[in-house]
């Protein structure tokens, strides 16, 4: 995190890793950080009332984590007060940019994992998050386990001769 920067620096957003103080919009990403014992790196969340993670609520009650309100209109002053290393959020189509946050100097990391069309593509994003938080080996190990299980079940399903296969629903709304 403190290593010297190359010169000249290319255009783009500089993110120094590992991230130690972040704002996280999604309970999916909070859960992943929980798996790696990195909940202490979450300084703020949006939509706390929708997060079904007792550990996140406990950290909020202890004053270790700030509720920033609705993810579509988060409390900008609280976000800036947190002084995060980065904001992890899900990009929305036609959102018109990030307003005040674009000018705040806080790096914005668009977590587009939910846009992946394959389960393994979506799962592989954990390697990216692992790099951000210094959990590369944990992320790689977790992904390898998921990949192995997925391929096993996929192979099993392809071998099924039954015309009456069960229907699977995901992403309940």
Please state what every model-predicted region is:
Residues 2-80, 86-93:
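A short, structured surface patch at a secondary-structure boundary
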Residues 21, 64, 77, 81-173:
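Extracytoplasmic substrate-binding proteins
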């Amino acid at each position: 995190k403190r290593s010297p920067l190359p010169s000249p620096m290319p255009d783009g957003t500089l993110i120094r890793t590992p991230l130690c103080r972040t704002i996280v919009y999604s309970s999916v990403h909070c859960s992943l950080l929980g798996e790696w014992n990195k909940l202490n790196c979450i300084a703020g969340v949006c939509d706390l009332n929708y997060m079904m993670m007792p550990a996140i609520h406990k950290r909020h009650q202890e004053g270790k984590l700030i509720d920033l309100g609705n993810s579509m209109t988060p409390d900008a002053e609280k976000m800036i007060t947190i002084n995060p290393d980065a904001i992890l959020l899900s990009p929305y189509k036609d959102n018109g940019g990030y307003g005040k946050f674009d000018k705040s100097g806080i790096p914005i990391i668009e977590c587009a994992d939910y846009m992946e069309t394959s389960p393994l593509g979506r799962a592989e994003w954990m390697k990216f998050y692992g790099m951000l938080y210094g959990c590369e080996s944990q992320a790689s190990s977790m992904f390898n386990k998921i990949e192995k299980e997925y391929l096993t079940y996929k192979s099993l399903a392809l071998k099924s001769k039954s015309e009456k296969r069960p229907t699977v629903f995901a992403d309940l709304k």
